[in-house]
Regions:
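Short amphipathic alpha-helical segments at helix-loop
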Residues: 22-23, 155
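A short acidic/small-residue loop/turn micro-motif
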Residues: 26-28
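Active-site SXXK
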Residues: 17, 30-53, 173
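Active-site-adjacent helix/loop patches that line small-molecule binding or acyl-intermediate pockets
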Residues: 43-160
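Long, repeat-rich segments with strong aromatic
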Residues: 160-177
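A short, well-structured edge-of-sheet supersecondary motif
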Residues: 1-22
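Generic structural signal for well-ordered secondary structure
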Residues: 3-5, 13, 31-37, 61, ...
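Catalytic-loop motifs flanking and including active-site residues across diverse enzymes
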Residues: 33-35, 39, 81-88, 133, ...
């Protein structure tokens, strides 16, 4: 279901790792683009920084997160925090089927020390059903040879964006980085 607009929580982790939270700390929400940094970490861990950034940029951009004009102009995504780059990033994580997603989920659980974290099936299915722009980016990159796998890789991206966390989990992720 949808998150209540009235729900609010605030969590911080101090320099000693102590978590302080107030508000609706048990309310879960999906990570969406926050998951991109975790997938990037897994991809770099497996492949090395040079291999990951061989086919995408790493500089900031003033373009919207779902911009993919650079794929037509330069032939590669602007950076891993934009959707095209994030889709390419998850395609670099080794394994078939949902293995890449499971690695991202495992890393989120490790960082947060919360093995109960999972993804929202409803949000995943909605993203999969309506993610035409992302699907277009996937196929442009597949057509140009940046991506060699199947649409399972795109599904992994939709699933990673659907991982549900709480404000405390997110504060722990911020503390980790």
């Amino acid at each position: 279901g949808k998150m209540s607009a009235e729900a609010i929580a605030f969590s911080v982790v101090d320099a000693n790792g102590k978590v302080v939270s107030v508000g609706d700390t048990d309310k879960k929400f999906t990570m969406q683009s926050i998951s991109k940094i975790i997938a990037l970490m897994v991809a770099v861990q497996e492949n090395g920084e040079e291999a990951v950034f061989k086919n995408m940029g790493y500089f900031g951009s003033d373009k919207p997160f779902n911009h993919f004009g650079s794929l037509e102009i330069t032939g590669k995504p602007l950076n891993p925090m934009m959707n095209a780059g994030a889709i390419l990033t998850v395609s670099l994580i080794e394994g078939d089927g949902e293995t890449a997603f499971q690695k991202v989920l495992k890393m989120v659980r490790f960082i947060t020390k919360n093995n109960n974290i999972n993804y929202s099936e409803a949000v995943y299915l909605s993203e999969k059903e309506t993610g035409h722009r992302n699907r277009g980016m996937f196929y442009i990159m597949k057509n140009s040879g940046l991506i060699n796998g199947t649409e399972d890789q795109l599904d992994n991206y939709f699933k990673q964006c659907s991982i549900e966390v709480t404000a405390e989990d997110l504060a722990k992720i911020g503390y980790f980085f």
